[in-house]
Amino acid sequence: YPGASIETDFAWAGKHPMVEGYKAYRKMPYDRPTWDMMSVLYVLRPEMFGVSEPGIICVDDQGYTYFTPTPRGKHTVLTLTPGQQDAVLRFFVRELSSKPAKYR
């Protein structure tokens, strides 16, 4: 998620949990992937993503994940073409930073 949006697009909210989480994690501004939101978006809009071939996901001792394709694998990962990446980013900036109708 773009740090510039975190800094400017949520002013309507006072203390927004997404903004506060980003600030607590690291000194602003910085851009950061948002895997949890991507997985939610995949449930709602699967056409915005691709899905990898089957494989196995392993987590190492430092917490890094690795995907190894294998025909008998039970895992897949979401994939994005450059066009899909741009569309997802635009969607997130537009939807996540907009003021909910309840508060307009």
Provide a role label for each language-model segment:
Residues 1-104:
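N-terminal acidic, glycine/proline-rich low-complexity segments
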